[in-house]
Amino acid sequence: VMLIAALESALGSDGGLSAVEGFMSSARFMQYMAGTTGLAFNFSDARETTQSFPAMFWYASKLGDPSLLWNEKIFLTREDTHFTAEEERFLPIILIYGSRFDMKEVTPPVSKIWTGHGKVPVALIRTGWDKGEGFYVGIKGGTASANHAHMDAGSFVFEAQGVRWAQDLGMQEYYSLEKEGVRLWNGDQDGQRWLSLIHI
């Protein structure tokens, strides 16, 4: 996003980068990944924690769609909001592009369903956008050979009335196994990586 903004500012064009298939729709995907509990759909290597995405302000400006800022508005007004040092470096994006919006007028998205039909298909469905209310379902398909998918051909989460009732077991840090001498990257039939599945 920052490269595209810099190219547009300096050269008047991003050279077609923002027109790459799926790039502009990735903002809506990120928005839908947060459930009504405030937790993220944590498939593959993803954690369930959510955070602010300052790039959403650029997307909202570029697409002329302030509803993309709905989750940002909630996140930035929470009392327990904090940023890591890595996240803090992107906060100026909020100042630059956020000045184009009146956050009091940001409304939730109208749509309640998002689907992605790629190699790893994803469907995200909700009954509303207010935290702690309604239902949220995230479903992921795919293949066991997809990168970072943990041999998982599918996953889902289900939330109702502010409670996550079902979810993927989540990721395990690679180091926790590697420090025990497990050779995770050996995909042979008799490789040690498969032993980790037996000891769950």
Question: Which stretches of residues belong to each language-model region?
Answer:
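Carbohydrate-active enzyme catalytic cores, enriched for enzymes
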Residues: 2-166
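Residue-level structural signal for beta-strand termini and adjacent loop
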Residues: 170-171
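A short, polar/charged loop-to-alpha-helix boundary motif
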Residues: 174-183
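Canonical bilayer-spanning transmembrane alpha-helix
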Residues: 184-188
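Membrane-proximal cytosolic segments adjacent to transmembrane helices
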Residues: 190-192
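Conserved small/polar residues in nucleotide/adenosyl-binding loops
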Residues: 198-200
